[in-house]
Amino acid sequence: MNFDVAIIGGGLAGLTCGIALQQRGKRCVIINNGQAAIDFASGSLDLLSRMPSTTYGENRAVENLKENITALRNELPAHPYSLLGAEKVLAKAQDFERLANELHLDLIGSTEKNHWRVTGLGSLRGAWLSPNSVPTVQGNELFPHKRIAVLGIEGYHDFQPQLLAANLVLNPQFEYCEVTSGFLNIPQLDELRKNAREFRSVNISQLLEHKLAFKDLVKEIIESSQGAEAVFLPACFGLENQEFMTALRDATKLALFELPTLPPSLLGMRQRIQLRHKFESLGGLMINGDSALNATFEGNKVRCINTRLLEDEEITADNFVLASGSFFSKGLISEFDKIYEPVFESDIIGVEGFNQKDRFTWTVHRFAHPQPYQSAGVAINAQCQVKKCGQFLTNLYAVGNVIGGFNALELGCGSGVAVVTALAVADEILAK
C-alpha cells in the first residue's frame, strides 16, 4: 500500500498532523494501536505551564507564554520549542486554536496567557486551552458564581464531591464562595452498580445518552443544587460531544460545569472522537488495532514499514511521521539496561545527565522530583526530522511526546508539544 504520508500513532499529535495534511491534498494513513493518552487526559491542553526546576528551585508557574517560551531556550536547548523557536511555536499554537474552532471542540483560552482550571480534587492547574464546560478563572480574578453545589453520583467512586468542595475554598479565587456537596440519585444506573468495574464515566454516559427519564434527571439536579447558582458535576454526561450537557444546562437554567474524573476521561475521548471523524471525513485512512513493527531504509530515507497485521504487505510512503507517544503508548520501550524506540531504532536523548544505557541516570532519589527517564525520547532537529546513528533521516519526522529532551509532566507542555510539532511537520512536508 502506498501513501503520501504514513503516520504511526493515532493520538492528539498524529490526528492533528493527519488533518492538516489531508486538508491540503495529501493522502495519509494512520496506524493506530489502540487508545491514546488523550483518552485518559483532562481535556485541557497545556502549552507551557511551568518553568524547569533547575533554575527556580520549585517550578515557577507560567502566565505570559511568549516571554517564557523564549526564556526556555536557555534552560532546555533540546526542547522542541527551543529547536523550533518561539515565533513558530506561537504561530502553530494559534493555528491549532483556529483548527479547534473549526472542528467545534468548544475550547477557550489563548496564547496570550494561561488560565487556571479546576481539577477533580479542587485544586487549580494552569492551562492554555480548556473545554468551555470546565470551570476556569483568569489570574487572581474571583469565580463569577458565589453559591456552588458540587454533586457526585451515588455509588460512583471516581469523583469525590466532599473532597473537592473542601479543597476548592482553599484557593483565593474561590475563598469567598459558599460551596456545598451532595449526590445525585439516578435510578437508571442501578444496573451498572451491580458491577463496580462497569460503573465508570463511559458506561454512565452511554446509558444516559438515550435521555432515559431526562426530566427526572433535570429535577434531581435542581433539587440537589439547593439554590446554588453554579453546579459542578463529574464529566459523565455526553460521550461524543457536549450536546447532552448543553441540554441539561438549558433545562435546569443553572450554570452547569463538568470536571474530569479518574480515567477514562470523557473530556479527552470527545476530542479524539471529533478529531478522528474529521480526519476520516477528509479521506484519511485509519488502520485501527495495528502497530508498526520495523522499517526498511534506503540511504538516509525510510522506504517502507511493516505492521503486525499486515506483515506480508509493505506500507510505503513519501514521508513518515512518528507520533507513537512515550512509554504509556509503547512509543518508547524500557528494558533493564536500555531505553529505545522500537520501530526505527532512532537515537535517544534526554535532559542533561541522562544516559539511555546507564540505568543509574534514569532516576533521582526523591520520588516526587522530576525523573530523568521522563525526558527520554527521539532526537530531532529544527525541522523535526529524526536522528538515527548520528544522521538525520530526510523523510522521517517525529511529533508529540515520542520526542526527547524535555519532561512534559514537569513543565506541563505535553499537549502543546503534540499540536505544535504536528502542525510544524505538516508544513515541512507540504513545502517539499
Swiss-Prot record:
What is the catalytic activity of this protein? a quinone + sn-glycerol 3-phosphate = dihydroxyacetone phosphate + a quinol
Annotated Gene Ontology MF terms? glycerol-3-phosphate dehydrogenase (quinone) activity
Asked if Iron is a keyword of the record, the answer is: no
- State the name under which the record lists this protein: Anaerobic glycerol-3-phosphate dehydrogenase subunit B
This entry's Enzyme Commission designation comes to 1.1.5.3
Please give the start and end residues of each transmembrane region: none
Record-stated family: Belongs to the anaerobic G-3-P dehydrogenase subunit B family.
The metabolic or biological pathway listed in the UniProt record of this protein is: Polyol metabolism; glycerol degradation via glycerol kinase pathway; glycerone phosphate from sn-glycerol 3-phosphate (anaerobic route): step 1/1
- Assembly and interaction partners: Composed of a catalytic GlpA/B dimer and of membrane bound GlpC.
